[in-house]
Amino acid sequence: MNAAGSPAVNAQTAQRWVLPQTNSTAASILAKSAGLPLIVAELLAERGVRSAAEADVFLHPRLEHLLDPYAMQGMAAAVTRVQAAIAGQELILIYGDYDVDGTTAIVLLKTALEMLGGKVDFHAPHRLREGYGMQAEVLTAAAAQGVRLVISVDTGIRDFAAAEAAARLGLDLIVTDHHLPHADLPHALVILNPNQTGCGYACKHLCGAGVAFKLAQALLEAWDLDRTRAKVLPSFLKMLAIATVADAVPLLGENRVFASVGLEQLRRPASAGLRSLLQVAKLDPARRPLTATDLAFRIAPRINAAGRMDVASDVVELFTTRDAARAGELAAKLDRLNSERQQAEAAMLEQIDRRLGEDPVFAASRCIVIEGDGWHRGIIGILASRVVDRMRRPALVIALEGGEAYGSGRSVPGFHLLHAIEGCKELFTRFGGHSHAVGFSLPVERVDELRRRLQAWAELHVEEAAPSMLCHAVLPLDQITEALFSWLRRLEPLGNGNEEPIFIAYNVRLTAPVRPIKDRHVCLQLAQGARGASWSALGWDWAARVQALGLQQGSVVHVAYKLRENAHPEFGGLELEIADLVIAG
């Protein structure tokens, strides 16, 4: 159904509509063997599904689809050392991070170790005072308190100095991390990272909590296999689903199992902390099942607010306390911190937008580097994402604090941001990250040199091209049915790597006058085919564009759209959400 010869560019927005190069023969074979509608088979083929068995795993993810934790390099050695620490009642320190991934990883591993009888302490670093990564000073204090085993979660793979400090202090170090390793690895007893050279673990895109979960899974299954699989792991997946969605790892492979089973388990939030957090986020899974969107935009920001605006250890307490009143207090605090974060973000974004519009240098830059005094260091990552959304180019936002500059960067598809900053690594005090996101610090006087060198790198690696929108398939409006929508729902949970499908319909006519909704929005009635039914198509923030296009009853357009279900008791049913639209012809 991905027809060739279709219009590729929206002339009104200069936005290219890009369709994947689907193997139609393979999709047809998959549709027949798995009993799928052809368009669903096409969507699955785009996601790497090749057989009926793989289609069943994708469409019906279950707990038994979890991978063997011992397939991860180093797992046997890690389990042996942790079991010895538990048996000997050694004090174990879990060293995490301050974001959703890092704090939930602490909760998962701490809960597992304490279930097994371990003596556990944890450290969630303060974003402003300590920054990202393990610090030698913290390890020194831990050793003085009797710690003999340190397990890092969502951090450690590039913490060479801290690893050396651990060795000098006589601490055994197990690094569990998902960030891309350097060519060299830190000195540690064991490293668990699916991305390290020689590791054959099938799912390379686990989040940090995912790696910590695999260690917990191996330990718990060795303790009581039946109980672990029947009760413990499903419960753990509630927390892991939040981390997996929040860290924007691809929702494919084992991550899809984490997210899908975890969302199902979240229908019954047993812990006081989860119940309280859902309450302040105004989510009731008893009335409506949670979605990945709920986790990404309603739950994760409140958890992240603790590390951005205050202390991340509040998150660990929230999810481990059994005191309902205390859980309510902590959830209310996270909700308040999230509101403060939103206000600070809006004020900083206004400054950035003004500078981007006033300074012509930014318009010509292939990579945006923008810095400011007094910017809140806990919010610069969000702001970098906002700049990427606006400029469609890699962006680094830097907060200047005295003589030190703290930065966060986000990228665009095809531009490996970590490789870019590795090309000028001598400028940094510290740095790390992924292909699409980085964090770093450097002396203020080196910011201009960083800007110059990143611009030179970007000139070679960022293509000048019209902004593009990935569409997934051609779906004429007269082929939409309730049955097809039911099949499409099985693609959930949706997210990175398994995006909500955007369909294209060509030569669609408006069957009624444009109906405005609250000034900024519109509702169009669209139909296709000689006897095609008319569909409501909602255009959020489309009022000005529809007016500029001069659309009226009888106009013929090409439309890129998402398929939605309106749950309104009186006006419910399927409807379209406009992603883009262009006049036909």
Task: List each model region and its residues.
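An acidic intrinsically disordered interaction segment
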Residues: 1-19, 167-184, 270
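Conserved strand-to-helix beginnings and helix N-cap segments that scaffold or border functional pockets
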Residues: 106-107, 135-136, 163, 185, ...
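Low-complexity, acidic/Ser/Thr- and charged residue-rich accessory regions of DNA metabolism proteins
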Residues: 2-53, 70-71, 474, 508-509, ...
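Hydrophobic helix-and-loop "lid/oligomerization" segment in the mid-to-C-terminal part
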Residues: 20-24, 29-146, 169-170, 221-445
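Mid-to-C-terminal polyanion-binding domains and interfaces
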Residues: 10, 84-88, 326-370, 415, ...
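Conserved phosphate-handling catalytic cores of large alpha/beta enzymes
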Residues: 142-148, 152, 156-249, 421
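Conserved beta-strand positions in the Rossmann-like core of class I SAM-dependent methyltransferases
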Residues: 121, 174, 549
